[in-house]
Amino acid sequence: MAAKEVKFGDSARERMVAGVNVLANAVKVTLGPKGRNVVLERSFGAPTVTKDGVSVAKEIELKDKFENMGAQMVKEVASKTSDIAGDGTTTATVLAQSIVREGMKFVAAGMNPMDLKRGIDKAVVATIEELKKLSKPCSTNKEIAQVGSISANSDADIGGIIAQAMEKVGKEGVITVEDGKSLNNELDVVEGMQFDRGYLSPYFINNPDKQVAILENPFVLLFDKKISNIRDLLPVLEQVAKAGRPLLIIAEDVDGEALATLVVNNIRGILKTCAVKAPGFGDRRKAMLEDIAILTGGQVIAEEVGLTLEKATLQDLGQAKRIEIGKENTIIIDGAGEASRIEARVKQIRVQIEEATSDYDREKLQERVAKLAGGVAVIKVGAATEVEMKEKKARVEDALHATRAAVEEGIVPGGGVALLRARASLAGLKGDNHDQDAGIKIVLRAMEQPLREIVANAGDEASVVVNKVVEGSGNFGYNAATGEYGDMVEMGVLDPTKVTRTALQNAASVASLMLTTDCMVGELAEDKPAGGMPGMGGMGGMGGMDMGM
């Protein structure tokens, strides 16, 4: 095992704080509407220009291993806040830096780090309660647009398009972000449930202009295995033909004789059908078939539940108002499923989301919720260059997360005002001893830091602005974008409560860990001996020469 370098006490903490400061100073310049850009080097191609705190944090790796440990811990604050709330990464970094910086002074003065931690925790719990009291629901389109704009670095277009998307597909609907083809942002909305499987044969197309198969008022047959033999299908096909309605077959696969017969019947106009493969793979395929069954009011024909194709009746089939099948996608519009069953299914998937351990699983489960809950909106981000596109896309994704957070837990006045108002209510908070009181003071001091940074980045005098905002009350604050004082809510400067809460919790959590650190262990760099000159090869063809004189 390689030898380790061990640092104790103040020397360990000093190196760690140095790393914290490097990362936090790089990230905090992006805070606020007048935040500065950070240029990130790329190994090939143009550098990336960003105002996104977490993107900057992820790029930073320090040469000194002990400083790097400090930087990585603050990076964790930023990425954790981004994962939970989708925004607030820069605020969280600024808060963490302030708590660490102030806390280290008290530790150096000989105070008990554990009592400081208890004081910090006490102040955070009390602040979160105050934030809940300040919070109000975010329900109107205007408020959603304002939250989106603030999170996208004061870009009103992005806020507006997100509000439109949420209006179209509902608060629970899926909103995805893609690269656009033009210079402007565009919004595409797909009503109903969409999955990424298309027709199994182009002969099913009945709308040549759009190159799609459109089935009006069809039955939907869901089968969890492969269909090759037409004999298995005949009983169902006869019943559907009598009813005089089209049929969509969704199965693991349809091939051979079965597919050929369906195509021939379709071409001759005897029975309007279309066949598609079931979406997903393995267990996810079964779950998605079940989702489609609940959405269309049908049943998955599976041996596990005692159903076979030969015995299937019209009652086992799902129904929908309209289904469009393209080359790569199928859209089920207005399925006939009961609302109560769909709701119950959504709740069940939500429980699975909370229990999911991997991001991939969580993302797929969220997609399923959205498909069931209604509609899919696609925001196509437009830009002139690829560099601008990447930066803009990251901002749209941030804004989208922030608006979801706002809908979930409500909104508070933005621009660092909410934390200052919460701080004013905590003036009488006391700890069990003098050291805990110091811990509470650390948090109260840190809570004015986000506003200080916003003001400093806008080129104004932080102390003057902070004092003026503290003297005010309610939503009174400073709008750094315009340089005006006034009611932050009326000016449209809003923050999601969840973002502010998560930023403070994560910052305090990691900062407390640092304050209670007394030892750091790192790899010791090995001193490798300098390499000698490589041996020189002899001249070819001279092996037999006698050098004797």
UniProtKB/Swiss-Prot annotation:
Q: Where in the cell is it found?
A: Cytoplasm
GO CC terms in record: cytoplasm
Annotated GO biological processes are: protein refolding
Name the positions where ATP binds. Answer: 30-33, 51, 87-91, 415, 479-481, 495
Q: Which Pfam families match?
A: Cpn60_TCP1
- Main localisation, per the record? cytoplasm
Might you give the EC number(s) for this enzyme? 5.6.1.7
Q: Which SUPFAM superfamilies match?
A: GroEL apical domain-like, GroEL equatorial domain-like, GroEL-intermediate domain like
Which molecular-function annotations from GO does this UniProt entry contain?
Answer: ATP binding; ATP-dependent protein folding chaperone; isomerase activity; unfolded protein binding
Transmembrane stretches, by residue range? none
Tell me the function of this protein: Together with its co-chaperonin GroES, plays an essential role in assisting protein folding. The GroEL-GroES system forms a nano-cage that allows encapsulation of the non-native substrate proteins and provides a physical environment optimized to promote and accelerate protein folding.
Q: What is this protein called?
A: Chaperonin GroEL 1
Q: Which gene encodes it?
A: groEL1
